[in-house]
From Swiss-Prot:
PANTHER family reported in the protein's UniProt record: PROTEIN NRDI
InterPro entries, A to Z: Flavoprotein-like_sf, RNR_Ib_NrdI_bac, RNR_NrdI
HAMAP family, A to Z: NrdI
Function of the protein: Probably involved in ribonucleotide reductase function.
Name of protein: Protein NrdI
């Protein structure tokens, strides 16, 4: 199975979700000056920001990570967290990244996620990678 890459703000909601998920993952640094580069296909797990609009929905650190052509070429899907209080904009970062990178928006969960979200993502990630061609 390939990896997960995620970003979590100082609220640590996405980080807590990833810890509970228990799958191999790399964290995009909170400090914008620190950079990471991935070397295998990945699913991106990202929180949504901005309170409703498209502008500002994707964290700056994630934009910088995806602006690296090497990193962007390896993304295979996106999972987004958000807050249902934002209505239609709930999980908007997933929609934005899916459209801009041409990858499927696989799942969304609220804040730290529920046990059901953890179970769904574990199962969904496993099934997703099983469906992918081996040389992708």
């Amino acid at each position: 199975m390939s990896q997960l890459v995620y970003f979590s703000s100082s609220s640590e909601n996405t980080h807590r979700f990833m810890q509970r998920l228990g799958l191999p993952a790399i964290r995009i640094p909170l400090n914008e000056r620190e950079r990471i580069r991935v070397d295998e296909p990945y699913i991106l797990v990202v929180p949504s920001y901005g309170g409703g609009g498209t502008a500002g929905a994707v964290p700056r650190q994630v934009i910088r990570f995806l602006n690296d052509e090497h990193n962007r070429a390896l993304i295979r899907g996106v999972i987004a967290s958000g807050n249902r209080n934002f209505g239609e904009a709930y999980g908007r970062a997933g929609e934005v990244i899916s459209q801009k990178c041409g990858v499927p928006w696989l799942y969304r969960f609220e804040l730290m996620g529920t046990q059901s979200d953890i179970d769904n993502v574990r199962k969904g990630v496993s099934e997703f990678w099983q469906r992918q061609p081996q040389n992708v």
